[in-house]
Amino acid sequence: MKRRILVRGVLVLILLLALYPLTKFVILPLFDTSGELEGHDVPLYGYSEPDTSMVMENDALRFELDPATTHFTLTDKRTGHVWLSSPDNADSDPIALPVEKNKLNSTLSLTYAASTGMTTQFTSQEHSISNGVYEVLMQEDGSVRVNYSVGRVQRSFLMPTAIGDARMQQFMEKMTSKQKKDIKEYYREYNIDKLRKTDDKAALLAAYPDLAEEHVWVLRDGTKDHLKQRCESIFAEVGYTAEDLAYDNSRIVQAGSTIAKAVFNVSMVFRLDGSDLVVEVPLDDLAYDVDYPLTSLTLLPAFGAGGTADNGFLFVPDGSGAIIRFNNGRVSQRAYYANLYGWDWASIRTQVTNETRINFPVFGVSGDSGSFICILEDGASWAGIGADIAGRLTSYNTVNATYTIVHGDAYDVSERTNNAVYMFETAHPTGFIRQRYRFLPESGYMDMAASYRDYLTAKYPDFAAQTVDADAPLSIELIGAIDKVQQVAGVPTSVPIAMTTYAEAKDLLRELVTRNLAQNMSIRYAGWMNGGMNQQLLSSVRLIRQLGTQEELFSFAQNAAIAGVPLYLDGLTAFARDSGLLEGFIAFRDAARFTTREEAEIPEYSPIWYGANDDRDTYYLVKPAIAMRSVNALVDAAASYGAGVSFRDIGYMLSADYDSKNHTTREAVLHQQAEKLAELKASGRDVMIRQGNDYAAVQATLITDMDFDGGQYSIIDEYVPFYPLALHSRVSYTGASLNLADDAEEVLLRSAEVGAGLQYTLTAQSARVLQDSTYSEFYGADASLVLDDITAQVAQYRQTLSGIFNQEMTGHERVGNVTITTYANGTRVYVNFGYTDAAVDGITVPARSYAAQQEVSK
C-alpha cells in the first residue's frame, strides 16, 4: 500500500467542499487536436546533376562533393589527409548486407513511424540518390546545400507516359531516324480498331479517352530506368518541356503519381569555417506527411570510417571520455549507444534496466594521419551517440549522432485490450541541427581533448578567464531531513526526520574547521526545507520545524561565512514530490505532459524487477515555467542567508514538456537553464551542480558527482580524462561521495587520475535513524564514525597532489596498470590501479595508490 498523508487529504477535501458552490465543471476532451497538422503530399525535389563537383576551399581545408552520389571528400591541407563521407569500397564489403551497404554509402539516414509504433529506416543512397529525387546547390554564401527527397518513390522523367498520335508526330518530325526507331521500340502505338486479343478495350478507353478519336502512344510496361533516360534525352533534344508533360498527363485518367505518402524532404548544408566543417540541417525546411512522423535523423553515419586494415580509435563521450580501438574484436558485445543528458523525463517508460547518459556532446575518430572531433552545437539535447566496430555488421568502424525529431509514446486505449496507439508530437522542432567537425593533424586523444577545451574557451570568454584554487577542492554534503511513515494520532503519516539539524550543521562545520579541512572546502546542505530530501514543490521555501529555527539556520550560514567556507543551499526545481493543493501544486495545471497528453506522473522503479514499484509514491515532472519559478524561489532563499545555490537537477536532468497547448522542447529547456545559470554567474552568485552537462559546467562554481566511469560498456577499451582536461583549472569538480560509494578506493584512484577533488556526505545522527526508511544509501554518512578516516584521506590527497588544481592538464598516458597525468607546471601524477607495486619514471607507486613527481619539467 502506498504511503498516504491522510491528514493532508482530509484538509484538501474540506477545502474542495467549501469551494464546491463556486465551481463549474466541464468535460474536456482527452486529446486536443487544435495543433494537429493537416496531412499533405510532399513535393519531390527534381533530379539535378551538375557537370562539375561542388568545391569549397580555404587555407586549411578543401571540400569536394560529387553531385552524382553526394559523397564528398574533405582534405586537410596541413597534412594532406583525405577524410571520406563514405568508404570507397563499401559496395564490395564482404560481410555487409545490402541494407548495411546502403547505410555506408549514405550521408543521411532516417526513421519514421506508423501509428502502431513500428519504425522503418530509409537511407539517402537507396531512397533518394538512386531515384534521382534530390538536388545539389551552391549557395550565394559559398556553402553547398543538398536537398533530399527520401522515400520509396520512382524517379520522374521528363517524357510522356502516354501521348496522342498528333502530338507524337510533331516531336518525331524533329528526331533522327535512329531516335525514331528507339521511340517506336520503347512505346506501343495503340489503335482502337486493331487491338490484341489480350487487350482490355474498356480499360484502355477509360485510361486514355483520346484513344476513341486517335491513336495513342503508351510507354511499355517494365521499361528500365536507363531506357527511360534515353527517351528523356531524345525528347529533351526535340524541345519537350515540363508544360508538355503536364498537358499529356492531363489527357490520362488516373495517370498515377510517383509521390508516395512516406516521403521526407530533408536538407543538409555544408560550410567551411577555418579548420572546421560545419554541417547543418534546417529543421524549418523539413517536410513529411503527418501520418508518417519523422522520428529520427542520423547525419554522416560513416564519415571518417576506419577499415579492417586501419589503425586508430573511435572516441565516445562516455563517463570522462572513452576510446574504442578499431577492430578490437568485441563483436559479441553490444554496440555503443548513449543519450545526451540522460533520459527525457517527459517520455514514458515502463521499466528501467539501464539508463544511459553522457554529459558533453563530442565524438571523434583518430587515425594514423590525424583526427577529428565532432561537436554537436545545436540540437544536442535530442541526440544520442552511437559507435560500432568492424566485424559485426560491416567491415568498418563508425561513430555518429542520431537525433530524435518527433517524440512519441504508447497510449493504452483500454484495459480490455493489449493494443496500444502511439501518439506523437504534433510538429517537429524548429531551428537547426548543427554539427561542427574540427580536424587536427595530431592523433592523440589528449590533443582532441585540448581542441575541445579551446572550443569552450573561445565560445565562453568568462569560462576562459576563470581560475580555481591550487589545492584540492573538498565538497561536504550535509543531509538535513529525510521522511518516514510514523503514527500521528494513530494515523500513518509521512513526517520529516532530522538527520542534521541547523544547529548540528554549525557544529559539524566547527569540527571540520578544527580538523584543518576548511581550505578550499564547500558545504552543500540538502534536505533543509520543504519536507526534506523528498522535497515538495518549491513554490516557496518553508523551513522544517524538526530541523530548528530560522535563527539557527542564519547562525550556521554566518559561521560558514566567517570561516571562509562557501555554503550552498540545495534544492530540486523540476519535480513535485509529495505535493498537493496545500503546497500550491495542481497536477492538471502544473504537471508537464507526455506526448499522450497525460500528466507526467513518474513512479519509483524497483532495482529488483526494474518495473514501477507500487509501494512507493509517484511524483510529477512540472512544466518548465513552474520549474523556473522554483529556481527563482531557491535562489532568493539562498541569497537571504548569504549562501550560494545548489541545484539537484539543473545541469544534470533535462526534460521537455509535450503539452500540445503549450509545447516546450528539450532544446528550449536547455537554453532556459543555460541563460539562468549565466545570469547567476554574472551576478556573482556561486552555483553548484551535479554531474555537469556541458552547457551548465561552464557556468558553475563547483561540479559534484561527476561520472568518470560511464556505462562500462564492454565494447569500450579504455576510459580517458577527455572532459576533465577541458574543464581542469577553470572549474572545480569532484566524483561521487567516497564514504557512500560501492568501491571508495576506485573512486579515489579515478579522482587522482582525472584531477578531481573529493566529496563526502555526512549526517549528525546515527545510521540507526535510517531504519524503516527508503534512504539506505546514507548508512555510511554518520559523521561520528567516518570523520577520522576522512581527515586522514583528505590530508594525504592534498599533500600528494598539491599545486595541480589550478593548472591545465596537458597529457595523459597509460603504462601497464599505471596512468600518468601531466600538468602545465610539469607535475606528473601516477595512479597505480594494479594490485602490486609498480616502478615508473624512477619512482615506485604502491599498489592501489597514487604518487606525484613535482615539476620535473616546465
Please describe what each predicted stretch is.
Residues 58, 65-77, 365-399, 576, ...:
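Active-site-proximal substrate-binding groove within the catalytic cores of carbohydrate-active enzymes
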